Amino acid sequence: MPRDYQAEKEKCKTFLQEFYKDDEFGKKNFKYGVQLANIAHREQVALCIDLDDLAEEDPELVDAICENTRRYTNLFADAVQELLPQYKEREVVHKDALDVYIEHRLMMEQRGRDPNEMRDPHNQYPPELMRRFELYFKAPSSSKARVVRDVKADSIGKLVTVRGIVTRVTEVKPMMVVATYTCDQCGAETYQPIQSPTFMPLIMCPSRECQTNRSGGRLYLQTRGSKFIKFQELKIQEHSDQVPVGNIPRCMSVYVRGENTRLAQPGDHVGITGVFLPMLRTGFRQVVQGLLSETYLESHRLVKMNKTEDDELGTEELSEEELRQITEEDFYEKLAASIAPEIYGHEDVKKALLLLLVGGVDHSPRGMKIRGNINVCLMGDPGVAKSQLLSYIDRLAPRSQYTTGRGSSGVGLTAAVMKDPVTGEMTLEGGALVLADQGVCCIDEFDKMMDSDRTAIHEVMEQQTISIAKAGIMTTLNARCSILAAANPAYGRYNPKKTVEQNIQLPAALLSRFDLLWLIQDKPDRDNDLRLAQHITYVHQHSKQPPSQFQPMDMKLMRRYITMCKSKQPAIPESLADYLTAAYVEMRKEARTNKDMTFTSARTLLSILRLSTALARLRLEDVVEKEDVNEAMRLTEMSKDSLQGDKGHASRTQRPADVIFSTIREMVPEKGARSVKYSEAEQRCVSKGFTPAQFEAALEEYEELNVWLVNQARTKITFV
């Protein structure tokens, strides 16, 4: 059906001038009028037209735009250009080179030209040169996002929305939009608008003077008078859940211009609205590959998406009601239990994973970097849901990568040198650890990795960087990610007759870099096995966790709360410094006396500091409190106890009351009063992993034996 494009342009003008929405006070808010005024005064560059707004006025025009987007982009741009003088109230203060150039040319033209003379079509100013704004369309909400493999020939020239993962991002480079030439004979200027990625420069001057005199003037490109725009190429790949059986994921090239550049990084899940266009091959490739043409998506709008849902990544702040719901009583336990609620038990492991997601605070004193990210290793028997926990964290973390030990090489984890298909230069392609920058990298089957590949992780886990010296490229890449590793013991199952080192068989240099190392054992216990079996059968039948008084939090809400927590930068007050140093010295002393199998070093103290700041972040506080330090020490002790759970019969037969007694006895000063403060004794025992109830029971038991006395106010324990 033929369309009158002049009438369509008038419709566009009317829409831009007259469209309004009522605000909360009932006043008319002219959405596009305000933006046009900003563009006229150079306060805004991009004008994004929401097709949902246009659908309220003219649904037919929306259909036409979706079918023939390139033509209507130019129509809308012409309409905006004609409307701008009406909205311009003052002169632009800061003028760039192109402004001055165009002003000079217009003044010269008005002086030297007869008013009745027609303008030569070859050297009249193209509209692209005069436009100082960019125009984009936002797809209507009724249009559904497509998979990469569903965008086919019927979508050519149409506005489509595609979802995928960004795999490659080129550098932003200037792309020529209008080429300006000067003739060496007559001095006339010629303009060449460029629509495609490649163009053939003009050589001979087309002006009337050169053609009349047959002087054969040659044209020279003037870069200062030409117009350039920012250009970037992305490669997106479809999601693994969208790939049919037996196929490999498809890729698509996306050309991004102007204000849409630098919005995505490799590894981001994005939704891109754009025009699907063909591009004929050029040069040598055209000769070799004949009539084949490539396709690409010319981007109009790029937004980051959530991984698991089809909605955009939530960046809005949490409301007061949502904050109140999260930060109610026992919110720490509630948040931890909301991590993988289908998995039974593992309360302390889930707390550690919650702190890993939140992370500690980075410090950079005088160029030396102290990491804030928390690294956790889950070691355990087969079938204790290690991989399930990893995959849940991969889904929950706003930015993450999931790899397995055997499927990852050292290059795949760090970086590879590749040849850029666009420019032909040697470039670096980031691996899993680089793609997980500012996020979490989950590595399953950590024990199956080759030793040569595993050494690539050492630098990342402490310095948070990757140093590369390959193919003449010397650089350092950022890899500020937390590492969550899952591994099986050396003999498949944990062998209690062997030492911890023989069971784990990972180098001490690597183990000391993990803040928490959990050993999850599958021990037979009738009551526990019964509850676990009931839980598993219920989940299998109903595909959800069993009903309980506790209601797990929504994944989207948790993701937004974790992002909010990361904005806090809590500090450790001076009042806690002595307490921390005393606690660390005590841990070193215990490691010496107990012949501890785990390695207690200065990194252990840094781990406690990281866990403490993560707990303070979780409470949205700016200062670390004593309870945070105690909880961090408790988690550290529990992770060590998990490693020593089967260390001979002595540790199994020792009752909690006996351990509490020996702990309190060690606190008694050698000289002076043989008494201990009740609160300090309780804190010491709780930090070692005992509950307040066990502490009370031990006090009563030894009080009946007349070993010590507790005063009535319960503030002091005195040895008899």
From Swiss-Prot:
PTM field: Ubiquitinated by traip when forks converge following formation of DNA interstrand cross-links. Short ubiquitin chains on mcm7 promote recruitment of DNA glycosylase neil3. If the interstrand cross-link cannot be cleaved by neil3, the ubiquitin chains continue to grow on mcm7, promoting the unloading of the CMG helicase complex by the vcp/p97 ATPase.
Reaction catalysed by this enzyme: ATP + H2O = ADP + phosphate + H(+)
Matches recorded under InterPro entries: AAA+_ATPase, MCM, MCM7, MCM_CS, MCM_dom, MCM_lid, MCM_N, MCM_OB
Residues annotated as binding ATP 2: R513, R603
Domain MCM: from-to ranges: 331-537
Residues involved in ATP 1 binding: Y344, G383, A385, K386, S387, N488
Zinc finger (C4-type) residue numbers: 183-210
Any one Gene Ontology molecular-function term assigned to this protein's record: ATP hydrolysis activity
Keyword annotations: ATP-binding, Cell cycle, Chromosome, DNA replication, DNA-binding, Helicase, Hydrolase, Metal-binding, Nucleotide-binding, Nucleus, Ubl conjugation, Zinc, Zinc-finger
This protein's record includes keyword tRNA-binding: no
One GO biological process term: DNA strand elongation involved in DNA replication
Gene Ontology cellular-component annotations: chromatin; CMG complex; MCM complex; nucleus
Family: Belongs to the MCM family.
Protein purpose: Acts as a component of the mcm2-7 complex (mcm complex) which is the putative replicative helicase essential for 'once per cell cycle' DNA replication initiation and elongation in eukaryotic cells. The active ATPase sites in the mcm2-7 ring are formed through the interaction surfaces of two neighboring subunits such that a critical structure of a conserved arginine finger motif is provided in trans relative to the ATP-binding site of the Walker A box of the adjacent subunit. The six ATPase active sites, however, are likely to contribute differentially to the complex helicase activity.
Misc. comment: Early fractionation of eukaryotic MCM proteins yielded a variety of dimeric, trimeric and tetrameric complexes with unclear biological significance. Specifically a MCM467 subcomplex is shown to have in vitro helicase activity which is inhibited by the MCM2 subunit. The MCM2-7 hexamer is the proposed physiological active complex.
Assembly and binders: Component of the mcm2-7 complex (RLF-M). The complex forms a toroidal hexameric ring with the proposed subunit order mcm2-mcm6-mcm4-mcm7-mcm3-mcm5. The heterodimer of mmcm3/mcm5 interacts with mcm4, mmcm6, mcm7 and weakly with mcm2. The N-terminus is required for interaction with mmcm3, though this interaction may not be direct, and remains in a complex with mmcm3 throughout the cell cycle. Begins to associate with zmcm6 at the neurula stage. Component of the replisome complex. Component of the CMG helicase complex, composed of the mcm2-7 complex, the GINS complex and cdc45.
Protein name listed in UniProt: DNA replication licensing factor mcm7-B
Source organism of the structure: Xenopus laevis
